[in-house]
UniProtKB/Swiss-Prot annotation:
Family: Belongs to the class-II aminoacyl-tRNA synthetase family.
Reactions catalysed: tRNA(His) + L-histidine + ATP = L-histidyl-tRNA(His) + AMP + diphosphate + H(+)
Subunit-structure text: Homodimer.
A GO cellular component entry from the record: cytoplasm
NCBIfam families in UniProt: hisS (TIGR00442)
Xref: InterPro entries: aa-tRNA-synth_II (IPR006195), aa-tRNA-synth_II/BPL/LPL (IPR045864), Anticodon-bd (IPR004154), Anticodon-bd_dom_sf (IPR036621), His-tRNA-ligase (IPR015807), HisRS-like_core (IPR041715), HisRS/HisZ (IPR004516), HisRS_anticodon (IPR033656)
Protein name in the entry: Histidine--tRNA ligase
Top EC class of this enzyme: ligase
Length: 420
């Protein structure tokens, strides 16, 4: 029997891993330069956490969650998104005692049972952060600004930030009624999912890809905002305009999670076709209370690593790739091996990537392997070199080689490599 990876998952290795490291390290740097702390939560939680937070009638809960019973009979779900676990951790660990305006970022795998396609897998990976405490539109601005900073730091330019306000529970009531009246006139023409959502969560009709043409003429949420929500949205746009962060107002944007209030946004990249979203987020002021805590304003964002990497490739952005096989030490004989290990240790202390042969191959086999792995230099040590107190440094690209006094080998090699 041949074992294969599960459908909707991927193995990541070789040059591809450098794209992942580039995205993750850039994200960490942006977050930590803004004073955002890292948080790590379990990849599985109680199912009810996501039912309460994401929404019982959402597509995620209805169709996409990986849910199972553990041996104690508890319903467990692999996390489909990262916000609810952070809120749960915040409440459970009494992090509110640290005061308001707390900020946490995360990087990790999420799980949804969807049809696998380019950039959309069943195990996918996200970067994200949550800002807990501020109600001011300054916080909404900061989130969008940091997302824009992160994407530009990666080198991306061909994306647009879509922005909307879906109001608070008070003003959204009138908006729901307006949508009911509008869609009620065309209900027979809608897809089965939209007919179900008409009764359970009518805002989700705006996000339907099948009946998208109806959303173009649907009532706009911004026309039903209360004075407080309208002022919040206006101020957010003023901040974005002042700092020249470009955005597109998109009044069909609602996002796929039920916990959002007021600000919602989505980043779409022009190089990814129909599945163009690479990041999104918004405000979720009612989620803490919904999960059993006090009412705490909060907001955040998440970006799909797979999608962001596709965007990098679509723009042809070159990323830094470190050669982890920079120096290869080829040895002949037991004594030469022991000295090779010592030299490798000296070079690694100087920050070089060094590999030592442990296969007892002939010299030709060792050098062939070094070239195959992409090593730039080979250090050759045999009985003759030991007797002379030297090592040979060979440039595997040019074939040039030089004899080096063993006592100064580490310094010489480190200096030689630094000049390339």
């Amino acid at each position: 029997m041949k074992y294969r990876r599960i459908k909707g998952t991927n193995d990541i290795f070789g040059e591809e891993i450098w794209y992942w490291r580039y995205v993750e390290e850039t994200f960490r740097n942006v977050c930590e330069s803004a004073g955002i702390e890292e948080i790590r939560t379990p990849i599985f939680e109680q199912t009810e956490l996501f039912v309460r937070s994401v929404g019982e009638e959402s597509d995620i809960v209805q169709k996409e969650m990986y849910t199972f019973q553990d041996k104690a009979g508890r319903s467990i779900t692999l996390r489909p998104e990262g916000t609810a676990p952070v809120v749960r951790a915040f409440l459970e660990n009494s992090l509110i005692d640290r005061g308001f305006q707390q900020r946490y970022y995360y990087i990790g795998p999420m799980f949804r049972y969807e049809k696998p396609q380019s950039g959309r897998l069943r195990q996918f990976h996200q970067v994200g952060f949550e800002i807990i405490g501020p109600e001011s539109p300054k916080a909404d601005f900061e989130v969008i600004m940091l997302v824009d900073t992160f994407l530009r730091r990666l080198g991306l330019t061909k994306y647009k930030i879509h922005l909307n306000s879906i109001g608070c529970p008070v003003c959204r009531k009138n908006y729901r009624e307006a949508l009911k009246e509008y869609y009620g006139q065309v209900l027979d023409n809608l897809c089965d999912d939209c007919k179900r959502r008409y009764e359970t969560n009518i805002l989700r009709l705006l996000d339907c890809k099948v009946d998208h043409e109806y959303s173009l003429n649907a009532p706009k949420s911004v026309d039903y905002l209360c004075d407080s929500c309208r002022a919040h949205y206006k101020k957010l746009k003023e901040y974005l305009n002042t700092f020249e962060i470009e955005y597109v107002e998109d009044h069909t944007l609602v996002r796929g999670l039920d916990y959002y209030t007021r600000t919602v946004f989505e980043v779409r990249h022009e190089g990814l076709g129909a599945q163009s979203a690479i990041a999104g987020g918004g405000r979720y002021d009612g989620l803490f209370a919904e999960l059993g805590g006090s009412s705490v304003p909060a907001l955040g964002f998440a970006g799909g690593i797979e999608r962001i990497i596709l965007a990098l490739k679509a723009e042809g952005i070159e990323i830094p790739m470190k050669n982890v096989h920079l120096v290869y030490i080829a040895t002949l004989g037991e004594k030469a091996f022991m000295d090779g290990v010592r030299l490798a240790g000296e070079l690694r202390k100087k920050g070089l990537s060094v590999d030592v042969d442990i296969m007892d191959r002939k010299l030709s086999g060792q050098l062939k392997h070094a070239s195959r792995m992409g090593s730039r230099y080979a250090v050759i040590i045999g009985d003759e070199e030991l007797e002379k107190g030297i090592v040979i440094l060979r440039d595997l690209e040019t074939g040039d080689q030089v004899e080096i006094d063993r006592d100064f080998a580490a310094d010489y090699i480190a200096e030689r490599v630094s000049k390339d």
